Amino acid sequence: MEVRLSAHGAYQHQYHVVWIPKYRRRILRGAIKLFVQEQLPQIQQYHPDVEVQQWSVQIDHIHMVLVIPPKYAVSSIVGKMKANLSRQLRLRYPELKRTYWGAVLWSPGFFSSTVGLNEAVIRR
């Protein structure tokens, strides 16, 4: 991974992020899965300096590797991604209303961890 430059510093922040549908429902299959896979890289339209490097859509969760500049909180970026994707899915697939009766499609939390150097590399 390369070092990126911002106005007043340099950074190398890479995050592994996982989130799940509410109630861990197995909705991410078929056409919905394909639609989600197409939409995940679109975050760069809203935040050009956030990079989606890798993603994997499983039947009941989503994995992503993101490069997020230090000026953004990981939680705000993930929250916006979940909100935008939820809105698009509910508009395109009205049958989701049978499974999710409110405006909420995703579980409220998410998992994130940093990706990068391990302890052995740092000691060297």
What are these regions (language model features)?
Residues 1-124:
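Basic nucleic-acid-binding interfaces
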